[in-house]
């Protein structure tokens, strides 16, 4: 199988064997030209001879059409994920037309009917979703730590871009530290507040910035890096069965 995740800035792919083990995986910047990037990867895909391509995409219809045209040249069946608020594995209170495909698949990859879960995605945006025994209750969306920093730098003449790090939530004694620690604290504080309101929910974090943020959260955190892939596999496995 070939699994594709077409995000806002990056294309990720996983090639898995017959028992679901990953045999090849990579992530690349697509620069809003995912079809062209895929064209350069087709030789690599063909070497593994996948029998199906499952696709998660947050891109618009125009780019998805170009991706479809490129994939059609492989002569391999492919299908895009369609968000469904009434999906059997997880119901959602959310308007499915407004629920991002990648966010939904991350939840689908984590959902456990026996648990209450607080799933936090740490990518281009910070998403916090509450799932009660496979029912999505809704959630919150924040700018990521890097989007917040970029916004502050672009809107404030007195603060210039620097190479500071998001490594502490204690007060800063330089502007550089104060900016980075303030941004990190705003996100950590929100997560701590939400987890305090929902003490019986397991906290799960995923995404590129998860490890940075998790160490400052005041609850045990389970880190997962396989949720979107797991969600893709669950989605198409259930589709085949039904």
From Swiss-Prot:
A monovalent cation. Ammonium or potassium. It is an enzyme of class 2 (transferase). Pfam families: Pan_kinase (PF03309). GO terms for molecular function: ATP binding; pantothenate kinase activity. One of its GO terms (biological process) is coenzyme A biosynthetic process. It comes from the Bacteria. Keywords: ATP-binding, Coenzyme A biosynthesis, Cytoplasm, Kinase, Nucleotide-binding, Potassium, Transferase. The active site is at 102 (proton acceptor). InterPro entries: ATPase_NBD, Type_III_PanK. Its main location: cytoplasm. Its EC number is 2.7.1.33. It is found in: Cytoplasm. HAMAP family: Pantothen_kinase_3. Catalyzes the phosphorylation of pantothenate (Pan), the first step in CoA biosynthesis. Belongs to the type III pantothenate kinase family. This is Type III pantothenate kinase.
């Amino acid at each position: 199988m070939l699994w594709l995740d077409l995000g806002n800035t990056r294309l990720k792919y996983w090639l898995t064997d017959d028992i679901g083990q990953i045999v090849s995986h990579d992530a690349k910047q697509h620069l809003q030209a995912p079809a062209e990037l895929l064209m350069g990867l087709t030789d690599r895909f063909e070497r593994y001879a996948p029998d199906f391509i499952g696709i998660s995409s947050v891109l618009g219809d125009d780019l998805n059409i170009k991706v479809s045209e490129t994939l059609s040249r492989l002569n391999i069946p492919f299908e895009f994920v369609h968000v469904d608020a009434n999906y059997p594995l997880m119901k959602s209170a959310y308007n499915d037309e407004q629920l991002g495909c990648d966010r939904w698949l991350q939840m689908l990859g984590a959902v456990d009917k026996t648990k209450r879960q607080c799933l936090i995605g740490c990518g281009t945006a910070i998403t916090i979703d509450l799932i009660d025994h496979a029912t999505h209750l809704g959630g919150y969306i924040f700018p990521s730590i890097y989007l917040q920093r970029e916004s502050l730098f672009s809107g404030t003449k007195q603060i210039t871009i620097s190479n500071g790090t998001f490594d502490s939530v204690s007060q800063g004694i330089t502007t550089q530290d104060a900016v980075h620690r303030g941004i990190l604290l705003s996100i950590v504080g929100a997560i701590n507040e939400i987890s305090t309101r929902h003490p019986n929910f397991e906290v799960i974090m995923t995404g590129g910035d998860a490890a940075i943020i998790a160490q400052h959260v005041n609850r045990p955190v389970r880190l997962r890096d396989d949720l979107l892939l797991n969600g893709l596999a669950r989605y198409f496995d259930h589709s085949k069965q039904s």
